[in-house]
Every structure is written in C-alpha cells, then in structure tokens.
C-alpha cells in the first residue's frame, strides 16, 4: 500500500447506527481498511491520558478487546509521560499489559539538528552557522519541543546572521515566558522536596549523606527515596541508572537562574 495524498477515504456508517452500536466506533478503522483492501496505521498521541478517563479500567479493557482482533490495522500509541505509560503497558494488572512492543525514543542528536535548522533559516534568507545551532540545541539539552521553540525565537530576532548573543537572549526570553508557570508549580512542592531539588541544582552527589540531609533540610535518608518516587511520578525528574536528571531542561535552568540563585 502506497500513500497517495490525493486519495480520499470514506465510510458508510451513519450517526444513528453508531448510537445504536457504539462499539462499532472501535472497529471503524478495521472496517474501513477491510472495505478498501488496505492496511492502516493509527497513531494516537499522549495515550497515557486514557488513565484519566471515567471508569478507565473498563474502557481500556474494551479497547484491547476490540483492537487485538484487528488484522488490517496497527496501532502506534505515543506518550510523553514515561511513568504513566509504563503503568499502562508494563503493569501486569492492566489491560494493555504486553499489548505490543515498547520503544523508548532517544533524544535527537545534535548532528541531526544542525542541517535541519540551518536549512530552515536559509529558506528565509537568514544564516545560522554550525556553532550557533550547536549552542541552541545544547542550551535546551536536545529537548525537541524546546529546540523548535528556541529556534523560532532566534529566527524572529535575526535579520541576517545569527550570533551567539542572539541565541542567549532568545534562551533567556524563553525562560522568562515560562517563569510564571514554573513559579506556580513551586507551590505544589513540600519543603523537603524543595530541599531535594536545591541539592540537585547544587550538584550534590551523595543525596542521602548526613551532611546533605541537614544542609538542605531533606529529612531522613528514607525520605530521599520517597521524594525521588514522588518527583518521578510527577515527571519532574527521571532516573537513569544512578543518574538523576530533570525532565524539563528549562525548569532546571529557571531553578538555577531565579529560584535558587
């Protein structure tokens, strides 16, 4: 099956029929694929939000019951909240346990960003050299959403040639735009969690040491474990091996620049 942007797909299930048989909606893609003798890939973003639906468990069971019978449709389920996705797909008690292959997408490498961003600037008769693209990408830790946001801010500030000062000005401007959002989030952290975040920003390695616990008023070493878990569930931090990283590089930068200055 070769994609054809000029093709139109249509189906003949009426609204009244769907009201009588709502389950038909879940089989709609399969019915359409069979009728057109094609194969479809259905992509659903932020799928972890299914956990927030009313009677979520029953809904997930129904989804799986229908989808697992589809032979002409493949489902690609995306999400940005790793912890919530893992609960949906890797929890043995959940309906979507082992529903398919799990893939963790890595950050886009800087070398991949360089030609892409330079080309976009060239299309507008603007020039951004390799070093400036590298600076732009590394400032936001290769975070794809922020790379594109920062690139746009740099583009708007540039008449002809991008210089490092423009990138840094745009970077600080982006942090300023998000500062109110970050500020409001600080009210949701406990004092011990704030102390833990401050220790991370300060580069402390021995987070459970007596000196660190006292210096940052974190509490007990057992509290460190609970704080880590709570912050991971909130998608504030990520734990890869023994390394703790911030999920949001601009939140980390704001903490360093403004909150814990």
Question: What residue ranges belong to the model's regions?
Answer:
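Conserved nucleotide-binding/hydrolysis micro-motifs of P-loop NTPases
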Residues: 47-49, 80-84, 108-111, 154, ...
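Winged-helix-like regulatory helical subdomains adjacent to P-loop NTPase cores
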Residues: 138, 142, 148-219
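Short amphipathic alpha-helical interaction segments
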Residues: 216-234
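Short, amphipathic alpha-helical interaction segments positioned at domain boundaries
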Residues: 250-261
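A short, conserved structural fragment
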Residues: 232-242
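Accessory beta->alpha helical hairpin/"wing" motif in late/C-terminal subdomains of nucleic-acid enzymes
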Residues: 241-252
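Conserved Walker B catalytic segment
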Residues: 8-81, 90
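Helix-loop-helix "sensor" segment of P-loop NTPases
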Residues: 87-138, 160-161
């Amino acid at each position: 099956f070769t994609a054809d942007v000029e093709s139109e797909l249509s189906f003949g299930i009426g609204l009244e029929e769907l009201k009588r048989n709502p389950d038909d909606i879940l089989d709609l893609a399969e019915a359409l694929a069979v009728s057109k003798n094609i194969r479809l890939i259905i992509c659903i973003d932020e799928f972890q939000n299914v956990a927030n639906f009313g009677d979520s468990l029953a809904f997930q069971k129904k989804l799986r019951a229908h989808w697992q019978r589809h032979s002409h449709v493949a489902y690609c389920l995306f999400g940005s909240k790793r912890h919530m996705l893992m609960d949906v797909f890797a929890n043995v008690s959940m309906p979507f346990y082992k529903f398919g292959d799990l893939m963790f997408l890595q950050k886009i490498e800087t070398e991949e960003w360089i030609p892409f961003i330079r080309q976009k600037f060239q299309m507008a008769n603007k020039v951004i050299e390799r070093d400036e693209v590298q600076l732009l990408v590394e400032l936001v830790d290769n975070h794809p959403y922020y790379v594109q946001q920062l690139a746009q801010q740099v583009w708007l500030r540039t008449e002809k040639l991008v210089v490092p000062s423009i990138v840094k000005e745009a970077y600080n401007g982006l942090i300023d735009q998000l500062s109110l959002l970050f500020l409001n989030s600080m009210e949701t952290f406990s004092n011990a969690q704030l102390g833990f975040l401050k220790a991370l920003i300060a580069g402390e390695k021995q987070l459970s040491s007596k000196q660190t616990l006292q210096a940052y008023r974190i509490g007990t070493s057992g509290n460190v474990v609970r704080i880590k878990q709570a912050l991971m569930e909130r998608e504030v931090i990520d734990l890869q091996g023994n390394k703790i990283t911030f999920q949001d590089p601009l939140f980390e930068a704001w903490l360093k620049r403004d909150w814990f200055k």
